Amino acid sequence: MRKLIVFIPLAILSLSVSAAADRANNAAPPENTESFVTSVESEIYYAPLDKRALPQERFVGFTPAHMVARVSLIAPTANDIKQARIDNERVAKRGIAAGGDAESAVPRDERAQQIGLPAYMSETATRGLAPNALTWLPDGLGGAVARFDVTSADAKAIRLGFNVGNIPRGATVRFVGDAENDRIFAVAGADIAGTEDGEYWSPIVLGDTISVEIQLRSARDRNALELEVFGASHLFANPAQNDNDLLKATKAGSQSCEVNIACSSDSAAKAVAAAVMRLVFTKGGSSFLCTGTLLNDTATATTRPFIYSANHCISTSTVANTLQTFWNYQSSTCGGTTSGPSTTLAGGAFLRVTDFNSDITLMEMKQPPPSGALFAGWNAGAVANNTGIVGIHHPAGDIKKISLGTMTNNAAPGFSGKTGTYYQVVWNSGVTEGGSSGSAIFTKSTSGSYQLRGGLLGGSSFCNAQSSPDIYSRMDLKFNLLQPFLAP
């Protein structure tokens, strides 16, 4: 028996949950004989609340304005941004042609919601930001600091890409945006140097200018520093909370039939929604949105922060390293259109499992999830036809929504070149969109909590065609890949 302590505001509840092996004899056998496993599962777990104040980060050095290196990037053109928005809009309107019906629905290939495009460095700018070209000043602690600013004109937010060689021990790099100068991200040099392929992407900061401060433990270390800015991702939509510009990634945001999670009368669905987060990541300088779900595991000694999402969102360690997560991005009221207080975590993730044909990706965050986050349960058995389904997601990058439907069949996706077998789901409330990709479908366990069963590949659902199916990955068919991490 695994004893889990659930921490929630204003109350402390003790939740006793059976581990996978204890529950195996009571689990109903799956109807689909393709499953590799029959009854392995996990229940929910809440991360403890931590009321300690986080340290206030700040730039440690004072660099006079005339000593700050400043460069401007070659930003994407207005036409480039317009085309990206058109592409997003095309995904949003994928379901039914004007005047068409459900039978005319065109399947939506898998597609993350794009919110950023590459911005490029000139050779002159690259040379100007080389460590030996910066002005280094004493930091008052025996070390040295240098600062530089990079601008991509009219960006709503920005992140820098670095080629990483040697980072001296004890180095710290700090990042801040000009539109939110009280939010400073401090990254240990060891974390930057630890990327597998020598490519590092900074945290996303708000505004069109990012300021970078490099602090070295010894002034002599500047001769050993190998850190080169090679470009940036210019975000044309702001991924931060309470910002309606994100909705302009498409012309109108998510579709009109989407339902805020706050509208749900299902307390178990509202609870598991705390495991669902918005994912922002960067591929080749372009930035995208998908949805992910924090998963529990059956190990008693540790609770590792695994995220279940989609292979078509993140399929390489390089991209997983760019991951930035947005938690509790949801309205507190049924009719709300903006998020309440939310939490942003940078730092990337380790890629643990990814599989093209099943469209499954499992990552492990490089830092703990925020205080009070929920680790969702999961069930690796097959889902029977006509089972009720709940989907929780961020359509078009919008605040968290809930969709209700039914698993109707097992199917090949019919698009995207993938050959796996998937769950087919039709909705009676809500639908999915670009940005929903990777989001989970859940079924209720015998305890009454929700368990993850798969993640969104794509589909053809639309507000005017809720009966047009969406396609979800099947955890049961690839649990042999997931088991070493989720049920070691």
Predicted region positions:
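Bacterial N-terminal signal peptides
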Residues: 7-16
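Non-cytosolic beta-sheet module surface loops
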Residues: 150-152, 162-166, 283
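Catalytic nucleophile loop of clan PA
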Residues: 293-294, 299-304, 430-456
